[in-house]
Structure formats: structure tokens, C-alpha cells
Amino acid sequence: MKTYLAVDIGASSGRHILGWLEDGKLKLKEIYRFKNGAEDQNGHLYWDIDRLESEVIDGIAACETAPESVAVDTWAVDYVLLGKNGERICPAVAYRDSRTETVPDELEKTVPFAWLYGRTGIQMQKFNTVYQLAAQKKEMPDVFEKAEKLLMIPDYLAYRLSGVAVNEYTNASTTAMVSAEHKTWDKEIIARVDLPEKIFGELHKPGEALGGLTERVKEKVGFDLTVRLAASHDTASAFLAVSAKDENAVFLSSGTWSLIGVELKTPVTNDESRAQNFTNEGGYEYRYRYLKNIMGLWMLQNMRHELGDENSFDKLTELAQSAADYKGRVDVNAECFLAPKNMCAAVKNELMKQGFKEPTVPEMLSCVYHSLAESYAETIKALEKLTGKIYTSLNIVGGGSRDEYLNKLTAKACKLPVYAGPTEGTAIGNLIVQMIADGELASVQQARDVIRDSFEIKIYEP
């Protein structure tokens, strides 16, 4: 029996999941899990990339027998730079770091956002890689004189496993430096930001084999296997796991971020799309993920932590339901919720600014739950206007698909049936790319049929 290993790393945790086909169904087994999180050092937020590498290797070693292949997916936009000997020459700064605070405005003269969006189709986020690189150029100009290669975080981890350093297309597309039309690095953007062109390597497709493990890694894990490229932006993998039956489905990858959108064959880069801040991220088989980033479970994760981690998410739901009639709402995409010192205080402040009296904890939680559901509904309306299509269902994958209360509120707000599951959407998407590349599955459509037959999909009617 052939098995495949997905390494799926999010902003708060990572997991290694084995997958295999058995009697026409996809089976999963989690074999390793670890915590992740950005760390504050000397005024900047960093990922402990060396620890992540160790965790990835330890998780591979936890396999009882060698899988056919392994692939790594992570969040988008963050990167490292390599020197001439393949060594990392800068830390992995986290996207929530404040170094890009003023960069979009500073670059507006040379890299106007309207022009940038027209070329890349990538939404305005101050932490987009193009702005991170501009911030680093300003803060550490010398590093670019030594830099030979830029690698996104999953590309770097795959490089540390295989010794082969390449740029994978789906994650590269989130940098706001890849041409939406040509699907290659945009040399004009690179020149305007005054970056060395040589650090941007040829873009490679998900599923490509990089080769076996390096001798160093092989020695640690006790066997060899093929290292493949995943659709290495976790959302690109998650969208693959949506078991929608037709083209009229909206996809929602629900985790720390909520990414809600549709698959399109061509990008939408017009002025209205730009004004609504929709993004066109590269997907598997060059299908565009036309979507919007919404703050997602990040707000609830932080509130839980502040209220005491002993409170389960079920407890938060219970508290929120006890104040279900509370009328206060916040813009879940407001800047103040991106990286506040205290999320509860940030929510409280926003509500009191609107004239509400100081909210209780249940009222704050109710506010966030309802605000999230209503933001999904607003996004679907905008999608219909921008694409000229009517959508008939919302399909949720990822950890948030387990949140029954949020799913019920979402179905009601969107006036659409909600199909929730599978939970491990990103890992499943990672696995099916490997299986298609190895010939175990014939196509994405066959994979989605298998997913529908393999996992419980809960339905919430409006």
C-alpha cells in the first residue's frame, strides 16, 4: 500500500498527516503535531525557522515505514534569502511584523498600487512580499548584495530536505511580483523596487519532484523518499480539497485566516475588483483563486488565549450564544485587529467608539461571531457582482468547518446552504497533489469525488 506524507504548517501549529487510498476512499492518519508562532525579538517578529526545520524532520522520522513522497505547505508571503553557498543570510520575519507599516505609501510614487494590481491581481495587504522586500532593502541594504536566491518558507523547508532550491508557483503568486497574465516573475516590478533579478528563480508547478532526501536528513530519519512540491500556499492546497459538485460553489478555507472565493480560469484585475480588494492567487493547474482575505479565527484564537486557554472553543460558543441578540458589530478586517496587544481590548474599543456601552465577554464574542458570518455574506454578494454569476452554496474546509455555531450563523447570513468539511482540508489538498503526480489519482475532479465519498460533510441550511 502506497502512503504519502503531507507536512502542513500554519501560523499557530503544524502537523504531519499520512494519506493513502483504501477501497476507493482516502484515509488519513496524523502522526506528528507541533506548535508554531512568531516570536518577538529586538523589536521584530520572527519565525523560528530552524526549529520548524527540526520539527519537519522529526515528523518524517515518526513514520513507521517510508512514504512514497513528502510535500510541505505553509502560509504565504514570508521568505528567506540564501547566499552564494546556499546558506540562509537573513532571519524569517513574520508577516505581522510592523516593518511594512509605511511602505505601501512610500512606494506609491514608483510602484502605484493601481498599476501593481493591474499586473499581478494581488490585493492590497501591507505585508505582501513586495512590501516586505522593500522594507528589508531599506533596513538591510547590504543583504541584497550577498543574496543569490529568494525562497518562500515552504520552498526553503523543501530545500532543506532535498538540497534543491526552487520557487513554487502558487506561493510565489502571493508576493505581488508575479504576472497574472504570464505566470512568471514580473521583471518591471522587480526593477521598480530595485531588487536583484537573479534572486527570483524559475517558477515550478505543484507536484514536481525535487529528488530524494539529502544524506544529512536521510541519516536522521532512517530512510529515503521523494520530496515533491505541494501547492505550497496552504490556501491553494485547501481549495483543492473542496468537494463541490459544480461551478456555482463558493469556497471558504477557514482557519487563522478566512479565505473566501471561487476558482476562475482567468484573473479579474479591473478597477472595481481592486476597489473591493479581491485577490487573484495562483492555483493548481493555473486556475486562479479569486478570493478575499478575512481576519478569520485569529480574533477568536486570541480572545480565547486572553480569557484563559482552559476555555475550550465550545465554551466560547456557549458564551457567545448567551448574548445572541447583541447588536454590536465590527469590521473584522480593520487594521486594529491584525496584531493588537490585546484582542479583547481592541474589540471593546471599537464597539465603544460606535457608542455601545462597555460590552461583556459574551457580548464581545457574539459580536465577533456575527461579524464574521456577515462579512462572509457581504463577500459573496461582491463576488456575484464582480463575476456576474449566482452562487448556490458555500463549501467550508479547514479547522473552522468544525465550528457549528459559526456555520449556522454563516448559512443564515449568506442565505445559502453551507457544506462543512473536511477539517484537514489543506493536508488533503497537499496529499492529492502528490497522488496525482504519482498516478494514484487521475485528476482533481476524481480526487474531489473521492473526498466526497471519504469524509463526513455536514450540511447547514439557511
Where on the chain are the PLM-derived regions?
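Short glycine-rich phosphate-binding loop at a beta-alpha junction
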Residues: 67-75, 149, 202, 386-399
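Active-site core segments that coordinate phosphate-bearing ligands/cofactors
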Residues: 5-6, 101, 108-120, 131-152, ...
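Short acidic-aromatic active-site loops that bind/stabilize oxyanions
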Residues: 45-53, 122, 126, 203-207, ...
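Short beta-strand-loop/turn "lid" adjacent to the catalytic site in phosphate-handling enzymes
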Residues: 61-95, 123-129, 158-179, 202-205
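Small/polar loops that bind or transfer phosphate-bearing groups
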Residues: 8, 92, 96, 128, ...
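N-terminal glycine/serine-rich phosphate-binding loop of ATP-dependent small-molecule kinases
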Residues: 1-90, 118, 146, 218-228, ...
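A conserved helix-loop-beta module that forms one wall/lid of the active-site cleft
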Residues: 187, 193-206
